[in-house]
């Protein structure tokens, strides 16, 4: 029985990952409106109108409070989505069903790419089953990866491209031109998905340099590297044409932010193998969490030291990305580390292997009371994999009971219907997710004074320091906003806006900001 399971072990691992991620998926989407912009751009690849979207979104981003997002996202991921949008559209799939199918396409392709990761691990660990299996399930079964299956963002797609690049980098080709073209294409698509895809060129340079020192053969390395560099730079140039405003954040870089981000990302990555336990430690005994994080990074360094020359290419890519994340003022969360996790898990498992050989196994052998079967590599690896699976299962069970469809809930759908049917085409709306409202209704939407009430729930305005009502209305009218959409949750305060209500349901209220836009007598109320 065990031999049969071992024969199909990788299929079983991927099947479990498919079920785990699938249980986390919900029809619709959570609030984050990055996905709405991705879908909007993907739709433009099918129907046209990208220039119009750029103009509209640029206006929205420039006039909204704070930095909401770029004028356009890099086109790699929207183009990927557009193929599936067209395919599912031909099958008649629309609405929330389309979003659900796109989630499966996004996650399913990542699972397919994990086959390349498996082949890469086989090369890196020289066929050592225990290390390969543990490193593989640490990615395939991890709760954060399964959780990401419920989001239409470029995280898994970009991580998959990086995995394919490194697998291709170490794979022999019959001809240099075919390998160079493949690597250059991957650099282009990765950089066209996220700007830090350009760091793959750094890893490529290191790989070729080390291989040159070993073989002393120049061959066509210079031409290959030039092809890859040109591909990456062209992708950056194409994205720069979108006028991305994210570079404004670089003005906020300071030493305090860098130190803070350094600690945040060290803790975040160091908590990855024992994610749920780390969350518990963070709430109860934070010093123990830092001890666990320290152990992780010690093992990563130890694993790095024991690997072959391929480690330098991986290490350069990890350090370049870590450097970018640390100096970037906005903390992005675990999803941005997805690209680095395949490498960190290789080093982490490598460090575990060294520790097991030098300390773990000798200690176990001295414990005569422990059964011999529990001292085997298969048992220890299986136990560690079970811990990862339990964490993933906890997340999947939690998501089956959680309705993550915030962006298309019944209440917000009522707002969309009102805006679509009652608001003039030239109406200007203020909503906390402007790109989502624009994608659904097609109307100009801005994020202006949408935090009104959030920071002052249950507090006097003088205590909270939040935006006052008069200041909010003045700001809205100065920006020529016609309709102000607020959630009732954020309006749990003493002073509610003294503006005409034109629409109201259990979750949201739409106020007419302009003095001639409506009155209480003609408002629409929905139970």
Please state what every model-predicted region is.
Residues 9-11, 130-137, 181-185, 223-232, ...:
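Signature aromatic-anchored transmembrane alpha helix within multi-pass, membrane-resident enzymes
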Residues 33, 101-109, 137-164, 169, ...:
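Multi-pass, polyprenyl lipid-linked donor-dependent membrane glycosyltransferases
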Residues 71, 75-79, 89-112, 148, ...:
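Loop-to-helix entry region of an early transmembrane alpha helix in multi-pass inner-membrane enzymes
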Residues 207, 219-297, 387, 391-394:
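Membrane-lumen/periplasm interface segments of specific transmembrane helices
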């Amino acid at each position: 029985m065990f031999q049969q399971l071992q024969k199909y072990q990788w299929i079983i691992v991927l099947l479990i990952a498919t079920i785990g991620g699938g249980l986390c998926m919900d029809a619709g989407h959570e609030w984050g409106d990055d996905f709405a912009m991705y879908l909007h751009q993907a739709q433009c690849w099918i129907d046209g109108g990208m220039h119009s979207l750029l103009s509209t979104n640029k206006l929205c981003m420039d006039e909204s409070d704070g930095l909401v997002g770029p004028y356009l996202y890099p086109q790699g991921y929207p183009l990927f989505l557009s193929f599936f949008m067209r395919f599912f559209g031909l099958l008649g799939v629309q609405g929330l069903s389309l979003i659900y199918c796109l989630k499966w396409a996004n996650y399913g392709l990542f699972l397919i790419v994990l086959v390349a990761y498996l082949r890469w691990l086989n090369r890196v660990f020289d066929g050592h089953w225990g290390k390969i299996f543990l490193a593989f399930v640490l990615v395939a079964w991890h709760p954060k990866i399964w959780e990401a299956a419920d989001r239409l963002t470029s995280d898994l797609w970009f991580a998959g491209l990086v995995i394919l690049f490194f697998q291709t980098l170490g794979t022999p080709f019959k001809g240099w031109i075919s390998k160079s073209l493949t690597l250059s294409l991957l650099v282009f698509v990765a950089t066209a998905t996220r700007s830090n895809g350009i760091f793959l060129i750094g890893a490529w340079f290191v790989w070729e340099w080390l291989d040159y020192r070993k073989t002393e053969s120049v061959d066509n390395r210079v031409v290959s590297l030039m092809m890859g560099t040109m591909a990456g730079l062209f992708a950056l140039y194409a994205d720069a044409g979108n006028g991305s405003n994210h570079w404004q954040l670089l003005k906020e870089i300071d030493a305090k932010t860098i130190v803070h981000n350094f600690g945040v990302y060290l803790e975040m990555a160091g908590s990855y193998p024992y994610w749920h336990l780390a969350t518990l430690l963070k709430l109860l005994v934070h010093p123990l969490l830092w001890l666990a994080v320290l152990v992780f990074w010690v093992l990563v360094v130890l694993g790095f030291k024991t690997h072959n020359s391929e480690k330098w290419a991986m290490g350069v890519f990890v350090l370049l990305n870590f450097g970018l994340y640390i100096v970037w003022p906005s903390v992005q969360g675990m999803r941005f580390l997805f690209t680095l996790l395949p490498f960190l898990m290789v080093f982490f498992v490598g460090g575990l292997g060294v520790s097991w050989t030098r300390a773990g196994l000798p200690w176990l052998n001295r414990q005569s009371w422990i059964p011999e079967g529990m001292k085997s590599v298969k048992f220890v690896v299986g136990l560690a994999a079970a811990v990862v699976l339990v964490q993933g299962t906890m997340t999947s069970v939690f998501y089956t009971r959680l309705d993550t469809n915030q962006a298309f809930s019944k209440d917000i759908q009522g707002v969309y219907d009102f805006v679509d049917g009652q608001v003039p085409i030239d109406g200007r709306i203020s909503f906390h997710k402007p790109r989502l409202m624009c994608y659904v209704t097609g109307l100009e939407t801005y994020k202006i004074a949408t935090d009104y009430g959030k920071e002052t729930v249950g507090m006097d305005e003088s205590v909270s320091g939040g935006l006052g009502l008069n200041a909010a209305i003045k700001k809205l009218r100065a920006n020529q906003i016609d309709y102000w959409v607020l959630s009732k949750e954020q309006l749990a305060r003493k002073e509610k806006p003294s503006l005409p209500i034109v629409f109201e349901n259990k979750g949201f209220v739409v106020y007419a900001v302009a003095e001639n836009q409506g009155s209480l007598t003609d408002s629409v109320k929905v139970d």
